């Protein structure tokens, strides 16, 4: 099936979806209605671009006819030639856009995410930088209209983040933040540095798609759940009733502790959400590691320890090492204005996928 047959099939399906969504039987079936609505929304951009492309093709045909019929009218012929030139340029742009729109979609792109940030090499400075990254993602989420909920956090003595787990919910969250997994390096002069020397520290980021129970069911026999008293600063127990939850997935050893909520059930529900995402991600990584060629055709190598970005404070510079992008906008990016970085990563990934399809 060539690209035009594919596009026509997408348009035919889009029109079929419009009819189905008007069917009373479908409207009364909430689950099916939501699934079909999502499918229609996911194909709308492709169909709109395809219809505009067909209009451009018609304009080219009309302009060519006008040139043939314009003998003896230089002004009309010149106007038709200009329209033909513009339409041919638009045709090429639409063809590139449509190729990208037809690329296989990542099934996780529309999902919410579990975001984990940890201070790594560099002690207190790494923890402080982890806090900077947390603020950056929170502010970026605000610009996108997403909901950002800190589910669990651990701070150190200087107010830095040892570890934080957050849920980010909204439209197409994973599609934009999936490229953030990896090691983020910071170069700056710490507040405690009296000699003005630049130190290098690292924080790690992990982005996992939220996994619903219907998508990945964990056998309860594989879980060990411990209930204990939540502890506050200094280690004292802050609740008379045991509400904190420690959940361990026995086959993998993956562990989650949750004590942010006031009730045991809420802590259990949050712990289950995180452990389901981590276990699913664990096995997805094993499968991905067996597909080296495919992994190398996309952004980075898929290695979670890969250094993906450097934030240089003295030079106000951010460098993404995977795509060779350098921006003298560190303050802007850390304030949550990440679009320029994320858009470049998306474009690079799409280009690489197109190249792999053409080879």
UniProtKB/Swiss-Prot annotation:
Single Gene Ontology MF annotation: translation release factor activity, codon specific
Localization (cell): Cytoplasm
GO (cellular component) term, any one: cytoplasm
Modified residues (N5-methylglutamine): 236
PTM comment, free text: Methylated by PrmC. Methylation increases the termination efficiency of RF1.
Entry keyword annotation includes Protein biosynthesis: yes
Keyword tags: Cytoplasm, Methylation, Protein biosynthesis
SUPFAM superfamilies with a match to the protein in the record: Release factor (SSF75620)
Keyword DNA repair assigned: no
UniProt family annotation: Belongs to the prokaryotic/mitochondrial release factor family.
Role noted for this protein: Peptide chain release factor 1 directs the termination of translation in response to the peptide chain termination codons UAG and UAA.
Name of this protein: Peptide chain release factor 1
Species: Streptococcus pyogenes serotype M5 (strain Manfredo)
Lineage: Bacteria, Bacillati, Bacillota, Bacilli, Lactobacillales
Primary gene name: prfA
């Amino acid at each position: 099936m060539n690209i035009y047959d594919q596009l026509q099939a997408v348009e035919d399906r889009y029109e079929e979806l419009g009819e189905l969504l008007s069917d009373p039987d479908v409207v009364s079936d909430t689950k099916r209605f939501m699934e079909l609505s999502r499918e229609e929304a996911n194909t709308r951009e492709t169909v709109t671009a395809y219809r505009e492309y067909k209009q451009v093709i018609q304009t080219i045909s009309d302009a060519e006819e006008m040139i043939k019929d314009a003998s003896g009218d230089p002004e009309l012929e010149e106007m038709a030639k200009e329209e033909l030139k513009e339409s041919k340029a638009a045709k090429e742009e639409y063809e590139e856009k449509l190729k990208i729109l037809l690329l296989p979609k990542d099934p996780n792109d529309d999902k919410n995410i579990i975001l984990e940030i940890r201070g790594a090499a560099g002690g207190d400075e790494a923890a402080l930088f982890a806090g900077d990254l947390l603020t950056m993602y929170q502010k970026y989420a605000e610009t996108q209209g997403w909901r950002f909920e800190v589910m669990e956090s651990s701070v150190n003595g200087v107010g830095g983040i040892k570890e934080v787990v957050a849920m980010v919910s909204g439209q197409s969250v994973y599609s934009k933040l999936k490229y953030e997994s990896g090691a983020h390096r910071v170069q700056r002069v710490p507040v405690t540095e009296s000699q003005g020397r630049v130190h290098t520290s690292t924080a790690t980021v992990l982005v996992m798609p939220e996994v619903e129970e219907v998508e990945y069911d964990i056998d309860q026999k594989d879980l060990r759940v411990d209930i204990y008293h939540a502890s506050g600063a200094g280690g004292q127990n802050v609740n008379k009733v045991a509400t904190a939850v420690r959940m361990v997935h026995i086959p993998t050893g993956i562990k989650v502790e949750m004590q942010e909520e006031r009730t045991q059930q809420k802590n259990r529900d949050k712990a289950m959400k995180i452990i389901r995402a981590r276990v699913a991600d664990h096995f997805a990584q094993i499968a991905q590691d067996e597909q080296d060629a495919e992994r190398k055709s996309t952004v980075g190598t898929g290695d979670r320890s890969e250094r993906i970005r450097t934030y240089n404070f003295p030079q106000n510079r951010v460098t993404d090492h995977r795509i060779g992008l350098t921006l003298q906008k560190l303050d802007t990016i850390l304030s949550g204005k990440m679009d320029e970085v994320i858009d470049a990563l998306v474009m690079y990934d799409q280009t690489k996928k197109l190249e792999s399809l053409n080879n």
